[in-house]
Curated annotation (Swiss-Prot):
Listed SUPFAM superfamilies: Aminomethyltransferase beta-barrel domain, Folate-binding domain
Similarity annotation: Belongs to the GcvT family.
Subunit structure of this chain's protein: The glycine cleavage system is composed of four proteins: P, T, L and H.
Origin organism lineage: Bacteria, Bacillati, Bacillota, Bacilli, Bacillales
Pfam families named among the record's database cross-references: GCV_T, GCV_T_C
Catalytic reaction annotation: N(6)-[(R)-S(8)-aminomethyldihydrolipoyl]-L-lysyl-[protein] + (6S)-5,6,7,8-tetrahydrofolate = N(6)-[(R)-dihydrolipoyl]-L-lysyl-[protein] + (6R)-5,10-methylene-5,6,7,8-tetrahydrofolate + NH4(+)
InterPro entries membership: GCS_T (IPR006223), GCS_T_bac (IPR022903), GCST_C (IPR013977), GCV_T_N (IPR006222), GcvT/YgfZ/DmdA (IPR028896), GcvT/YgfZ_C (IPR029043), TrmE/GcvT_dom1 (IPR027266)
Name of the protein in question: Aminomethyltransferase
Length: 362
């Protein structure tokens, strides 16, 4: 059996009461104090996530921008230095290799932050499709990454840095930022639906920054709450809302797919065809009317006919209702449409509802 991978924060987990699980080959905390309490901490105060398992891939060289334009669906030329952009990497079929964030450090240097379980696959795909004078390097082992999320994130982080955090706009970042005596990159971004920051630092210093932030009275947060938070905010999870068989258009990520950008990109032709023909299925929000929790891969029915599948589901800690995302036949995606979810050989009533399920007050 392959030994599970560990983040640089791993030695500290036990000290804070972490219960760990195998997550895509990594030994990561599913919870600390408990999923519900952790979820609430992020929605009302702040919480700290160890996300050092995420992959980082460095792209540098004079042709970096044109290479990424070819590789990714969004418009890379629109990114200013010191800004980040959400992106999708597609196969020729339009299916998804991964979703990721691109950080522009200079005109010739970018860092791509990718899903942990996809790092090796993404890197291989990027090398295979290399164009022009660029180098692509997997630098994942060099970085630790923490996410401080919640309405009080800025106030807390301000105690540990001299950087004017209020000047960092959403998806903006600052390099060489001192946090608790460690040189970091601070990005105003996250995966929770709340305000917050993702902080990158050398792996060896990750534990120091982790403990310095927790010492400010912040709760450590595990993967369980990370999932309920991102689901309420309707943020896609690769392997569930996106996959090699699910295109970004089907997943409702049109804002990150620039079919009109001049540059050709991998999957562009297939996605244009899909858009012109009209989507056969799309991602919608569902809320259960009867008791039961929708889970990944549960079937969705209408009048005994299977019309789709649940991609993600949970009991929403914020709303107190049982919610899910489902990829279903476009003909049945009107708001208010009643459907049924197959849960343990029973069909449980649900309805299609607006998304996101949760949106923070600005």
């Amino acid at each position: 059996m392959t030994e599970l991978l560990k983040t640089p924060i791993h030695p500290l987990y036990a000290k804070y009461g972490a219960k760990t699980i195998d997550f895509g080959g990594w030994d990561l905390p599913v919870q600390f104090a408990g999923i519900k309490a952790e979820h609430e901490a992020v929605r009302t105060d702040a919480g700290l996530f160890d996300v050092s398992h995420m992959g980082e891939i460095l792209v540098e060289g004079p042709d970096s921008t044109s290479y990424l334009q070819y590789l990714l669906t969004n418009d890379i030329e629109k990114i200013k230095i010191g800004k980040a952009q959400y992106n999708i990497m597609c196969y020729e079929t339009g299916g998804t290799v991964d979703d990721l964030v691109v950080y522009k450090k200079s005109e010739t240097e970018y860092i791509l932050v990718v899903n942990a379980a996809n790092t090796a696959k993404d890197f291989e795909w990027m090398v295979k499709n290399i164009q022009g004078d660029v180098s692509v390097t997997n630098v994942s082992s060099e970085y630790g990454q923490l996410a401080l999320q919640g309405p009080n994130a800025e106030k807390i982080l301000a105690k540990l840095t001299d950087v004017d955090l209020s000047s960092i706009s959403f998806f903006g970042f600052v390099e060489d930022a001192d946090v608790a005596g460690v040189k970091t990159i601070i990005s105003r971004s996250g995966y929770t639906g709340e305000d917050g920051f993702e902080i990158y630092m050398p792996s060896a210093d990750a534990g120091k920054v982790f403990e310095a932030i927790l010492a400010e009275g912040v709760a450590p947060i595990g993967l369980g709450a990370r999932d309920t938070l991102r689901l309420e905010a309707v943020l896609a999870l690769y392997g569930q809302e996106l996959s090699k068989d699910i295109t970004p258009l089907e997943a409702g990520l049109n804002f990150a797919v620039k079919l009109k950008k001049e540059a050709d990109f991998i999957g562009k032709e297939a996605l244009i065809k899909q858009k012109e023909a009209g989507l056969n299925r799309k991602l919608v929000g569902i809320e259960l009317i009867e008791r039961g929790i929708p889970r990944h891969d549960y079937p969705v029915f209408l009048n005994d006919e299977e019309i789709g599948i649940v991609t993600s589901g949970t009991q929403s800690p914020t709303l107190g209702t049982n919610i899910g995302l489902a990829l279903i036949d476009t003909a049945y995606t009107e708001l208010g449409q009643e459907v049924e979810v197959g849960i343990r050989n029973k069909k449980i009533k649900a309805k299609i509802v607006p998304t996101p399920f949760y949106k923070r007050a600005k």
